[in-house]
Amino acid sequence: IRSAIVYAYESRLVDVTVLEELFIEVYNLFEGGTPGVAELREPLYYFVSDYCDRMLPWRVRETLDPSLDFGKSIIMDSDLNDLRYLYRFGEYISETELATARFMNELPEETVRRMADTYTEGYRKGFAATGRSYEGKKTVQIRYHIGFERMIRMAVENFRELGLEPIIARASIGTVNRMAARTNGYYGTPANRQYEYDHRYDNAVYLDKAFRERKLSILKVAYETYKDLASVYAGPAVVETFGEAGFEPVNAAAAFSLSEKQEKLLLSYSNEAMQIVDAYIPGTETSFTIIAFPLPEIGAEFEAIFKETIRINTLDYELYRDIQQIMINELDQASQVHISGRGGNRTDLTVQLHTLAEPTKQSNFENCVADVNIPVGEVFTSPQLAGTNGLLHVGSVYIGEFQFKDLEIRFENGIAVSYTCKNFETEEENKALVKQMILKNHETLPMGEFAIGTNTTAYEVALRYGILDKFPILIAEKMGPHFAVGDTCYSWMEDCPVFNPDGREMVARENEISAKRKENPQEAYFGCHTDITIPYSELDTIEAIHPDGTSVKIIAGGRFALPGTEKLN
């Protein structure tokens, strides 16, 4: 029903009308007394089922069609010095959005230009780094937090110079299209984060096999309808934010939850939906970029932190590229990597690496500089699952907007066999939180990535301003080793060659599970990739273990120890 607010702003009168009809239908049920659950469920189920063929195609179109310019016209045509423009978006506008826009307006022109240029140049470099071309592509989707319009306006101009017309759709709304993390478009600060958490599984009211089949059928027809627009789409350019106050959810007894059967239906829908999308927008033909900036909520030193973030986002990528290559040269001689924590961190984990057939031409690690993931600072691989064993433990880590306390995941042959945290009083609630927020409702997941972050500059800034728990995973993953559960970084693109700056091919693009993709894609992918970082302060050692049993320390006592990497300290 709350979607009617957006529909009113966008003059979508038919959509407002059908929601009002639903409201009246439900209201009438209460006129004769309190209806039963089944009686209430029926109109909700048939509303979603009947109008899915209206709501879902619209969402597909608005993420592909630049002529739907409701948000873009506000950004490009408004007087950004008059902050009343923010209220034209139809989103909740808090003091955060007002303060952000006010701050952006006060920045020097060259500073905002530098932010926009770094963002759009990262997008361009992303295509170049993967050997792809955006020639023939005509559109790019911009996703961002409301308040950054001055930067986004410049980014629109930059993308147009590249021959790409920006699509700026709002984050999805309505139960049929809504994502758990509502950041797949332009969006504002949630009015109530507990409310968002409570309603994350409202689809439990109507999700069954028949609806799953209907939604997949409609999705296929929608992409077929808009296949010409899909064929010229180059991929998303994302501006993330950080600095919000920590959020610890409370499990409300009245909130909906998915049954085990519904969880399986949702996962199977996600897998098949990805296959449909990839058929019309092949991952081998697109790219992306992500950059992050702080929000005023981060505290009194917001302005200083903002300037430091710009510095972090524009570090000398050549320096990091060369140091990271030294690390890769050593890691490529290893068969395993061992990671151990210190102090209260109980991490004791061995990651198995793939065997290189031609070491002079191949590498196990990608040398990641500032292109698709800004800022610079990591080397990463897809571990071999067999032989990857041990405990991953982090005392405190933010994943999305949730702070996990004493997170533990134990791996056997690369698969998570147990997991827990200390957020709630009962073990059942703790396991459920990890399953929902990290494993995305899968019973278990493989380790899809192992990486070593090298951005000690960001780490120093985090310590100096006391914001270690505020940085988003985009930056946090560069501040220590990190591990991802779920798909590899190369899902749906394993067969697309990737080369490091030294000319060697990064060949560790699949694992034993994603290798099933050609015979059975449904068993090869999970539709999720969740990063978990161990901060340097909790890290003791990362050592490369050679096939003959000898080892070389990459990090010792939380500091870089490999000769040639000392500058990172």
Tell me the role of every PLM-derived stretch:
Residues 147, 244-246, 295, 344, ...:
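Short, glycine-/Ser/Thr-/acidic-enriched flexible segments
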Residues 332, 400-403, 443, 476:
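Short solvent-exposed loop/turn micro-motifs enriched in small/polar/acidic residues
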